[in-house]
Amino acid sequence: MFSTFLTALRTCVVTMVLTGLLYPLAVTGLAQLLFPGEANGSWVKDGRGRVVGSALIGQGFTRAGYFHPRPSAAGAGYDGAASSGSNLGPTSLKLKERAAAELERLRRENPDAAGPVPAELVTTSASGLDPHLSPETARWQAARVARARGVALERVLDVVDARVEGRTFGVLGEPRVNVLLLNLALDRRFGPLPDAAPGVGGRASPGQGAP
């Protein structure tokens, strides 16, 4: 019986060392060697080298001179510690009322936008932290951004087109635009908005309220 116990103990210790120490160290080492940026959280820095967020976690931009992301049901909105969807079903009256309110707000804030309001801008993602928009949804907001920044619409559209990411490996997903990276590109191209600049809701330059 004692030999059986020793065998079990040795097996337990070896397994703990392999799976709890050596394997995590090997994976961490390879990740740091091959793709250190992604392994460390895909941090995004501004022009002064300050970390302003992660490329993987959306932020709730609301100022008129920035592109806005999808609505978020994560905490008070884009709370990285409270990732979740709304859990409202297609027959939910609350969902219908919220979508109607979003539609009204978006039409009011984007009077020069061409075409109907994109569905993305009135629906939350499953995680509540989606950092991307479709290129079409970003372009729909371009007129508001151009007006708020006092630049030509074509110049803002050029920034959007330059930030479009293609399908992963050429086949997975759809073309998309990272909202945080897009707004940082706006600041690099046209300069950051002054802190006192009027906003739609009054918040959020890149990094303000960053996760």
Swiss-Prot record:
It is found in: Cell membrane. Coiled coil: none annotated. Keywords: ATP-binding, Cell membrane, Ion transport, Membrane, Nucleotide-binding, Potassium, Potassium transport, Transmembrane, Transmembrane helix, Transport. The chain crosses the membrane at residues 13-35. Pfam families: KdpC (PF02669). GO terms for cellular component: plasma membrane. Disulfide bonds: none annotated. InterPro entries: KdpC. The keyword Cell membrane applies. This is Potassium-transporting ATPase KdpC subunit. It comes from Myxococcus xanthus.
